[in-house]
């Protein structure tokens, strides 16, 4: 059994999935996972498929050094973005596993929301590359561990809006500023 970094807010109405030592770039997976955090599972799957088809991009916020700009990142109020296909495929597999775990628990698929998404670094895979003049340089891979927790959304009761008009109290300065702005006196 895997130890998760945190427990879900509601144990009975949640599902978990974990991927360990995944041979996919840590930085790309981190940015992709951050992009789907808080989404409904069905929306996250649609988004990841759009990234694979290059219809939408993954905004690179933290690990953005040397990342080119793309117009699709404007949807996230950002300028830099990429389309990390391998990370998307790994996350899609984990989301599929998460849905299966939720189905076993009897949770409703359409209400699953990704509450917790975390990507951790795994130990570096070390290889070597042979260069000219007898030199040897390291050839490293940076795998990662990914954990997902989805919670079934509860039906929210709409907030009550008061019918009475609220009396706004203002001091002299605020009242004078309001008069200047509107151009008339308030009674």
Curated annotation (Swiss-Prot):
Keyword Ribonucleoprotein attached: yes
Q: Which domain of life is it from?
A: Eukaryota
GO BP term, pick one:
cytoplasmic translation
Entries under Pfam families matching the protein: Ribosomal_L22
Molecular function (GO) terms for this protein are: structural constituent of ribosome
The UniProt record lists the keyword Ribonucleoprotein: yes
Q: Which SUPFAM superfamilies match?
A: Ribosomal protein L22 (SSF54843)
A GO cellular component annotated for this chain's UniProt record is: cytosolic large ribosomal subunit
Q: Which UniProt keywords apply?
A: Ribonucleoprotein, Ribosomal protein
**In which family does this protein belong, per the annotation?**
Belongs to the universal ribosomal protein uL22 family.
Q: What is the protein named?
A: Large ribosomal subunit protein uL22
| Organism per entry | Theileria annulata
């Amino acid at each position: 059994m895997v130890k998760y970094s945190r427990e879900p807010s509601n144990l009975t109405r949640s599902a978990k999935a974990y991927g360990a030592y995944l041979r996919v770039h840590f930085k790309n997976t981190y940015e992709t996972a951050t992009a789907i955090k808080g989404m409904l599972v069905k929306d996250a799957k649609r988004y990841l498929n759009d990234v694979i088809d290059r219809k939408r991009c993954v905004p690179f916020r933290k690990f953005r050094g040397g990342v080119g700009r793309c117009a699709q990142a404007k949807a996230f109020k950002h300028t830099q973005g990429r389309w990390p296909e391998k990370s998307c495929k790994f996350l899609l597999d984990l989301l599929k596993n998460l849905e299966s775990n939720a189905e076993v628990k009897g949770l409703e698929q359409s209400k699953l929301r990704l509450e917790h998404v975390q990507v951790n670094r795994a130990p570096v895979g070390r290889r070597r590359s042979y260069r000219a003049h007898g030199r040897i340089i390291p050839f490293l891979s940076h795998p990662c561990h990914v954990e997902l927790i989805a919670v079934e959304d509860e039906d929210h009761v709409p907030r009550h809006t008061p019918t009475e008009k609220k009396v706004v109290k203002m001091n002299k300065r605020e009242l004078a500023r309001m008069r200047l702005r509107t151009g008339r006196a308030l009674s």
